[in-house]
Curated annotation (Swiss-Prot):
Region: Disordered, residue numbers: 532-565, 586-731, 752-822, 1031-1061
Effect of residue 112 to A: Reduces RNA cleavage by 98%
The protein's name: Ribonuclease E
Other remarks in the entry: In K12 strains that are derived from W1485 (including MG1655 and W3110) the rph gene has a frameshift that leads to loss of its ribonuclease PH activity. In strain K12 / MG1655(Seq)* the wild-type Rph protein has been restored.
Length: 1061
């Protein structure tokens, strides 16, 4: 009769044995420190994806991450819009940080982590549920005949949810459809609880732990052929009755009995010796032969020896009978030891093929009762049989053994003499190294005795050959023969320590493996779900949901606290100045700053988990630092603007209406248009503020505070590139407008004068042009030049081209960079001093540079030359009204900074600035400036002078004077009223014309004649003629080559060797 014996007398080890009479055929041992992890369900997080392995590594709570192959990933973890074309790519399926529910398919072995799967399987008494694998399912392969047909009909009547698979176990044979449906409903309830628990906590943690050894034994081994279940512990007996009832096997409750005999349970049935055989390498056979089982990293090798076997009439019969016995014992040992993987059996050689087939059939019949899947091949011509067995759990040796600290698992150690000679060679090798003072050898006692006695002369020879090197050999009784340490001590590192104290000194370097780490037992992790106490109501999740209502009102409360009404007086004056100046023009939107920021912050916090927002946040952070870096320059610019703003009294009545409109627009504006709206607002704000009149000095401090408040509440939006906020307004004006310039009026200000350091003093000579568009300010040119310099001298691109159109553009850009270099290969200073350049033998080729860039560089040089220590800012009262007039075809005076002689005792350098830069472009045709042209310019100025009408009586507009080309540089220049300046400049131009007969001015172009460097007159050297003549070649010979033309021949007849007598 078959029995199940459960030994629980020792709490450190629980053993379950299945016996048939007194023959042990299955064994399961579990220790508290070696619980089985296979079939445990975890919630893990993907930490790394390896496309080369087509797998992902998952952190599920263990020290070593699990291995999740691509084929073990369920379809439910694929992206919603994923469409597989051929072989799927794991990077398209999974992403790092994704949380998955995994089950351990193979436990950790050696250096390999656990193999995981997302196809969960929940094993019950009669059924195995595959909740996310619809392709899996069927009936156990052991069930055959009519039982299989009945189970198919029962399966058809079960209510299985869509997308799930079901397997009927062997224990389900003969069960009714109601019993199968009850087990199925239990598994479905279990799966729902697993999903609920997975949603309650973040990964990684253990959701479901596989049952202990008793429950597994009841679930896997309880069959109708089990006659009784004997347990030697009353507490375990009560626990077993509960498990039987929970598993739905009430028919076995009567078979559970308590063993109360004096003899231990396993000894009573004489299976202790059989259990011990499962831990031994060699197992004896009844006939006298033996089998030897060796487990390696790759496979398990089993060798069969006849040994003392004498059964049989001849050697062939003896080999055949021994192999038959070995086949039965091998099948039994595989179950007892739970060996899995590849197994190779070396049977005793058998000549007849029928004997080989008989042994194969005996082995197949012996493993039929094994739960694991087994595949067996035929015996090869070398007498080897290959088979594979499913690894259900760690083998008996892996769960109860550890690697030997002495032999490191090899089973052998090196001989003392061989090890001593190896240490001696290593000592000499260390002594040969440079800067070696001592060599310390810490060795076991037998090795030290051999080196200090038998090999004393060899040690002395090493010290003699290596002058100054001292060999110290120290015996250590804590060491065993395979281990030793040879340490090299450099000069200056030696310590005055006694030799027998060296092992303690080098204790860290030796670091012998301790056995304490094997004795450590980790505290088992508690699962989130109880195994058998399955509640009808899923477990309540962790208190994460109540936090949602607290977070939700946060974005709604943000817009309710506008930042604009904080200082109504400042904003009213600011809006009043803008409204009064433009009189109902385009409305400004400075109060949009606080509203978008109040809404953007909660929005960005909500999008923290979106991976596509990471780059945008990075750009915002970079922009924050850039704005802080340029805060000082922005404040200075704002101060200059605010001084030019006029205080208006009529704006206070419009404050409430504008505030309501701006707030409404800010709330209803789309978030996608926030960056564009911010950029347009800044450009409009800069243009308008550039035209504002100067504010009174009593409100200057308040304006500075308002500017700082505006900078603080300005929303941070991603921009392509930070732009300089000094853009000027461009207008088209007629000849009369540009020619009219009011006289310069110096105003005395009661307050302390403000000294500006940035711009240098500039003077402008007004020209009479055709109707043209005004030139931009030097600041704008510098900005454009800076942008061009950033882009390698080329215009900045507004956007990035599509990826599929980018290759040819890159090729053109590379060709352009190579064809037109931005730097000269030879420095200009060296070229000017070179006589070869002056004589025309060497030419430097430069890239095409716009004339505007050349003029800007010349202006910079002029500004550097004319910098003076004292600079006084004098506002110029001049108002210009647009006048539309017909084109006037007159010559245009070039903008020239010339010395102006003033008969005053103390000349001063006066800087005049104007927000509108009026610099007329010259005509395209180069023309010569004459006196008549200057007179015409004066007449036009006089005729256009009465047209001037000031827009506002209190408006003080400063004139920005632009410099162009330096003719004569003087240390001091004073700006005078417009009309006299024109006349004096004309005279100056006459004097210049006396030196240079013709001065041509081209459109946006500046030239200068080439100045020859002082060098002696170049006289080319006459070519040299040589008198050498090629000698005539006289050929002597027959005019042919080869053996047939030879004149001398030598030959030798073949000689026969002399015979040896």
């Amino acid at each position: 009769m078959k029995r199940m014996l459960i030994n629980a007398t020792q709490q450190e080890e629980l053993r379950v044995a299945l016996v048939d009479g007194q023959r042990l055929y299955d064994l399961d041992i579990e220790s508290p420190g070696h619980e089985q992890k296979k079939a445990n369900i975890y919630k893990g997080k993907i930490t790394r994806i390896e496309p080369s392995l087509e797998a992902a590594f998952v952190d599920y709570g263990a020290e070593r991450h699990g291995f999740l192959p691509l084929k073990e990933i369920a379809r439910e973890y694929f992206p919603a819009n994923y469409s597989a074309h051929g072989r799927p790519n794991i990077k398209d399926v999974l992403r790092e940080g994704q949380e998955v529910i995994v089950q351990i398919d193979k436990e950790e072995r050696g250096n390999k982590g656990a193999a995981l799967t997302t196809f969960i399987s929940l094993a019950g008494s009669y059924l195995v549920l595959m909740p996310n694998n619809p392709r899996a399912g069927g009936i156990s392969r052991r069930i055959e005949g009519d039982d299989r047909t009945e189970l198919k009909e029962a399966l058809a009547s079960l209510e299985l949810p869509e997308g799930m698979g079901l397997i009927v176990r062997t224990a389900g044979v003969g069960k009714s459809a109601e019993a199968l449906q009850w087990d199925l409903s239990f598994r479905l309830k279990h799966w729902e609880a697993i999903k609920k628990a997975a949603e309650s906590r973040p990964a990684p943690f253990l959701i479901h732990q596989e049952s202990n050894v008793i429950v597994r034994a009841f679930r896997d081994y309880l069959r109708q052929d089990i006659g009784e279940i004997l347990i030697d512990n009353p507490k375990v007996l009560e626990l077993a009755r509960q498990h039987i009832a929970a598993l739905g096997r009430p028919d076995f409750s009567s078979k559970i009995k308590l063993y109360t005999g004096e003899i231990p349970l396993f000894s009573h049935y004489q299976i202790e010796s059989q259990i011990e055989s499962a831990f031994q390498r060699e197992v004896r056979l009844p006939s006298g032969g033996s089998i030897v089982i060796d487990s390696t990293e790759a496979l398990t090798a089993i060798d069969i020896n006849s040994a003392r076997a004498t059964r049989g009439g001849d050697i062939e019969e003896t080999a055949f009978n021994t192999n038959l016995e070995a086949a039965d014992e091998i099948a039994r040992q595989l179950r007892l030891r739970d060996l899995g993987g590849l197994i190779v059996i070396d049977f005793i050689d058998m000549t007849p093929v029928r004997h080989q087939r008989a042994v194969e059939n005996r082995l197949r019949e012996a493993v039929r009762q094994d739960r694991a899947r087994i595949q067996i091949s035929h015996i090869s011509r070398f007498g080897l049989l290959e088979m594979s067995r499913q690894r259900l759990s760690p083998s008996l040796g892996e769960s109860s053994h550890h690697v030997c600290p002495r032999c490191s698992g090899t089973g052998t150690v090196r001989d003392n003499e061989s090890l001593s000679l190896s240490i001696l060679r290593l000592i000499e090798e260390e002594a040969l190294k440079e800067n070696t003072q001592e060599v310390h050898a810490i060795v076991p006692v037998p090795i030290a005795s051999y080196l200090l006695n038998e090999k004393r002369s060899a040690v002395n020879a090493i010290e003699t050959r290596q002058d100054g090197v001292r060999c110290v050999i120290v015996p250590n009784d804590q060491m065993e023969t395979p281990h030793y340490h040879v340490l090299r001590v450099r000069k200056g590192e030696e310590t005055p320590t006694l030799s027998y104290m060296l092992p303690k000194l080098h204790e860290e370097a030796m670091a012998l493996p301790s056995e304490e780490e094997f004795a450590e037992r980790k505290r088992p992790e508690q699962p989130a779900l109880a195994t058998f106490a399955m509640p009808d109501v899923p477990p309540a999740p962790t208190p994460a949901e109540p936090a949602a209502p607290v977070v939700a009102p946060a974005p709604k409360a943000a817009p309710a606290t506008p930042a604009a009404p904080a200082q109504p007086g400042l904003l009213s004056r600011f809006f009043g100045a803008l409204k009064a100046l433009f009189s109902g023009g385009e409305e400004t939107k400075p109060t949009e700053q606080p509203a978008p920021k109040a809404e953007a912050k909660p929005e960005r916090q909500q999008d923290r988990r979106k991976p596509r927002q990471n780059n945008r946040r990075d750009r915002n952070e970079r922009r924050d630092t850039r704005s802080e870096r340029t805060e000082g320059s922005d404040n200075r610019e704002e101060n200059r603007r605010n001084r030019r703003q006029a205080q208006q009294q009529t704006a206070e009545t419009r404050e409430s209406r504008q505030q309501a409109e701006v707030t409404e627009k800010a709330r209803t504006a789309d978030e996608q248009q926030a960056p564009r709206r911010e950029r347009s607002r800044r450009r409009n704000d800069d243009k308008r503020q550039a035209q504002q009149e100067a504010k009174a000095l009593n409100v200057e401090e308040q304006s500075v505070q308002e500017t700082e408040q505006e900078e603080r509440v300005r929303p941070v939006q991603p921009r392509r590139k930070q732009r300089q906020l000094n853009q000027k307004v461009r207008y088209e004006q007629s000849v009369a407008e540009e020619a009219v310039v009011a006289p310069v009026v110096e105003e005395t200000v009661a307050a302390e004068p403000i000294v500006q350091e940035a711009p240098a003093p500039r003077t402008e000579l007004v020209k009479v042009p055709l109707p043209v568009v005004a030139q931009t300010a030097p600041e704008q040119q510098e900005e454009n030049n800076a942008d061009n310099r950033d882009n390698g001298g080329m215009p900045r691109r507004s956007r990035r081209s599509p990826r599929h159109l980018r290759v040819s553009g890159q090729r053109r850009r590379r060709y352009r960079d190579e064809r037109y270099p931005t730097q000269s290969p030879m420095p200009l200073t060296v070229a000017c001093a070179s006589p070869e350049l002056a004589s025309g033998k060497v030419w430097i080729r430069y890239p095409i540079v716009r004339p505007q860039d050349v003029q800007v560089e010349e202006q910079r040089e002029q500004e550097e030359v004319h910098v003076q220590p004292m600079v006084t800012e004098v506002p110029v009262a001049a108002a210009i009204e647009p006048v539309v007039s017909a084109p006037v075809v007159e010559e245009v005076a070039g903008v020239v900074e010339a010395p102006v002689q003033v008969a005053e005792p103390q000349p001063e350098v006066v800087e005049t600035t104007h927000p509108e830069v009026i610099a007329a472009a010259v005509t395209e045709q180069p023309q010569v400036i004459t006196e008549s042209d200057v007179a015409v310019a004066q007449e036009v100025a006089e005729q256009a002078e009465p047209v001037v009408e000031p827009q506002e009586e209190t408006a003080d507009i400063e004139e920005v004077v632009e410099t162009a080309e330096v003719v004569v540089a003087e240390p001091e220049v004073v700006a005078q009223p417009a009309a006299p300046v024109v006349a004096e400049v004309a005279a100056e131009v006459e004097t210049v014309a006396a030196v240079e007969p013709e001065v041509t001015v081209e459109h946006n172009h500046a030239t200068a004649p080439m100045t020859r460097a002082p060098a002696p007159e170049y006289v080319p050297e006459a070519p040299r003629h040589s008198d050498w003549q090629r000698p005539t070649f006289a050929f002597e010979g027959k005019g042919a080559a080869g053996g047939h033309t030879a004149t001398h021949h030598a030959s030798a007849a073949p000689a026969r060797p002399q015979p040896v007598e």
